């Protein structure tokens, strides 16, 4: 069967593979486009397997939202260079939108989610790996499904936040999401802080006190320690932090002034918790040139 340009074009549109790869797939499969697509998927998976042990610590946080339903996904690449590649960026958007329209609650469940093209996210991942030449990982997925006020915010593709408010408007929700992106509070309010953390901080503050202060009456000593602990708790809670969009008030004051309440939030940052491999510049250039 003759391998026409239109047949190659159709296979490229279906699979996202390169022109020469599509032509080879069609030749190998006697012009059968379905068999050629399957051949490309298998080829992509084989290439992906060879790269699976490489550390992927760069990447992008992508988001998708429809009303009170919102998701964040973290997709990792090996280098910042590929993290800016149009094929990679398009893939992260595909993953985010597929996640939004699925019931998946984690990255593992996302692998088998089918796209409009009929392929799974895992199969698309393998195809993109074949194009960009790096290990890619769909590492994390977080979502909020709520009838409340929900905002999704991504800063520079590196940090993403989902926040849920009861009450307030879209502007407030986005402002709170921006604050969380910037300040990374571990907890919403003081009652969320573990008692073990508070006890440990009290122990530390007491150990730091001078003998003169320790000799003060118990009630005075308790006030001093309580003041220090209150400051620490404010630093680790969203409500206790000065609001980045108006530092004259705390986040709690800003939220309550709008008659709202923060129900919860999720925050992802690219590569957090992944041990990166340090390489020299020459090695990085060689890798990008396909020489390493």
Swiss-Prot record:
It comes from the Bacteria. The keyword Cytoplasm applies. Residues 79-82 are annotated as: Involved in Mg(2+) ion dislocation from EF-Tu. Coiled coil: none annotated. Pfam families: EF_TS (PF00889). Its main location: cytoplasm. Keywords: Cytoplasm, Elongation factor, Protein biosynthesis. GO terms for cellular component: cytoplasm. One of its GO terms (biological process) is translational elongation. InterPro entries: EF-Ts_dimer_sf, Transl_elong_EFTs/EF1B, Transl_elong_EFTs/EF1B_dimer, Transl_elong_Ts_CS, UBA-like_sf. One of its GO terms (molecular function) is translation elongation factor activity. It is found in: Cytoplasm. Belongs to the EF-Ts family. PANTHER family: ELONGATION FACTOR TS (PTHR11741), ELONGATION FACTOR TS, MITOCHONDRIAL (PTHR11741:SF0). Associates with the EF-Tu.GDP complex and induces the exchange of GDP to GTP. It remains bound to the aminoacyl-tRNA.EF-Tu.GTP complex up to the GTP hydrolysis stage on the ribosome. HAMAP family: EF_Ts. This is Elongation factor Ts. It comes from Xanthomonas campestris pv. campestris (strain ATCC 33913 / DSM 3586 / NCPPB 528 / LMG 568 / P 25). The lineage of its organism: Bacteria, Pseudomonadati, Pseudomonadota, Gammaproteobacteria, Lysobacterales. The gene is tsf.
């Amino acid at each position: 069967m003759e391998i026409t340009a239109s047949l190659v074009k159709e296979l490229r549109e279906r699979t996202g593979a390169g022109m020469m790869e599509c032509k080879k797939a069609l030749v190998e499969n006697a012009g059968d486009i379905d068999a050629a697509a399957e051949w490309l998927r298998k080829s992509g998976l084989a290439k992906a397997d060879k790269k699976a042990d490489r550390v992927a610590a760069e990447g992008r946080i992508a988001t998708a939202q429809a009303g009170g339903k919102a998701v964040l996904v973290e997709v990792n690449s090996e280098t910042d260079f590929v993290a800016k590649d149009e094929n990679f960026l398009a893939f992260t958007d595909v993953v985010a939108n597929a996640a939004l329209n699925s019931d998946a609650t984690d990255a593992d469940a996302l692998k088998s989610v089918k796209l409009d093209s009929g392929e799974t996210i895992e199969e698309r991942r393998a195809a993109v790996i074949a194009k960009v030449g790096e290990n890619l990982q769909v590492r994390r997925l977080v979502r909020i499904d709520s009838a409340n006020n929900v905002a999704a915010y991504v800063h520079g593709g590196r940090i993403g936040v989902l926040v849920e408010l009861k009450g307030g408007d879209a502007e407030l929700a986005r402002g709170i999401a921006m604050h969380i992106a910037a300040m990374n509070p571990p907890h919403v309010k003081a009652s969320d802080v573990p008692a073990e953390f508070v006890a440990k901080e009290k122990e530390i503050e007491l150990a730091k006190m001078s003998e003169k202060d320790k000799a003060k009456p118990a009630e005075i000593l308790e006030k001093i320690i309580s003041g220090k602990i209150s400051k620490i708790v404010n630093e680790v809670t969203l409500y206790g932090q000065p609001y980045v969009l108006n530092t004259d008030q705390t986040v709690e004051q800003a939220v309550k002034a709008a008659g709202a309440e923060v129900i919860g939030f999720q925050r992802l940052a690219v590569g957090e918790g992944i041990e990166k491999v340090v390489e020299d510049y020459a090695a990085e250039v060689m890798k990008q040139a396909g020489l390493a």
